[in-house]
């Protein structure tokens, strides 16, 4: 597959397709404790669940999914820690807040203790960081938004869509693909049906009833 293409996997049998999606969802959510899945990233086997974002139903895109928010807070933490001056400012500000709280806690008729250090990701969780979900935003625009998020929080991971082609016209799909390729986001879209002529940026893998794979 060329670097400027994204993967499209077509499964012919609906029953297999549903089972495949169900299994992928469990892998992404790390629910299959007995059957772990891996993905190859930079020639290394990496945990599938930690490196894949699976969009099962784009009509109900949840930008504040626990996994996404956790990835966003981790990204912000890494960025802040890598900037020594900003990180020092963060720690100093937190300690000032602790000092103010302790001025009141010390007056209580019993002993108390506080956490003197806190990670940035924990701090962001405490202030309830969320992605603003514009309900008036079109489904088309929301797909671009999730591509932005996926590319930011895990640029080497994979963003997986199910039935993406069912929701958009060919011209819209090509624009989505182009945006993902331009932003170097690895995208896999899973579809059900017969083989078809690839659109621009598509690299099609066709899977038959016996789960044999054929490239278009």
Q: Can you say where each PLM-predicted feature lies in the sequence?
A:
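Structural motif
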Residues: 10-15, 19, 161-166, 191-193
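Flexible, charged surface loops at secondary-structure boundaries
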Residues: 1-4, 150-156, 181-182
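Alpha-helical oligomerization segments
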Residues: 170-216
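Glycine-rich P-loop/Walker A and Walker A-like loops and their local beta1-loop-alpha1 context
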Residues: 1-81, 85, 170
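Conserved P-loop NTPase mechanochemical-coupling segment
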Residues: 96-138
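GG-anchored amphipathic helix commonly corresponding to the ABC/SMC/Rad50 NBD signature/C-loop
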Residues: 139-155
């Amino acid at each position: 597959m060329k670097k400027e293409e994204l993967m499209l996997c077509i499964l012919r049998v609906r029953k297999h397709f549903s089972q495949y999606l169900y299994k992928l969802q469990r892998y992404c959510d790390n629910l299959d404790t007995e059957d772990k899945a891996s993905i190859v990233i930079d020639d290394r086997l990496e945990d599938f669940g930690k490196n894949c974002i699976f969009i099962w139903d784009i009509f109900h895109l949840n930008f504040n999914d626990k996994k996404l928010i956790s990835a966003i807070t981790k990204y912000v933490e890494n960025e802040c820690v890598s900037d020594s001056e900003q990180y020092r400012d963060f720690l100093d500000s937190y300690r000032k807040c602790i000092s103010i709280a302790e001025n009141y806690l010390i007056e209580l008729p019993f002993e108390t203790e506080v956490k003197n250090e806190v990670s940035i990701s924990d701090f962001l969780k405490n202030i309830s960081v969320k992605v603003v979900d514009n309900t008036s935003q079109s489904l088309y625009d929301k797909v671009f938004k999730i591509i932005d998020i996926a590319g930011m929080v895990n640029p080497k991971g994979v963003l997986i869509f199910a039935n993406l082609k069912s929701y958009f016209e060919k011209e819209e799909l090509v624009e989505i693909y182009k945006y993902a390729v331009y932003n170097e986001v690895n995208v896999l879209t899973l579809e059900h049906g017969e083989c078809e002529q690839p659109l621009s940026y598509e690299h099609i893998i066709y899977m038959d009833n016996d789960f044999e794979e054929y490239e278009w």
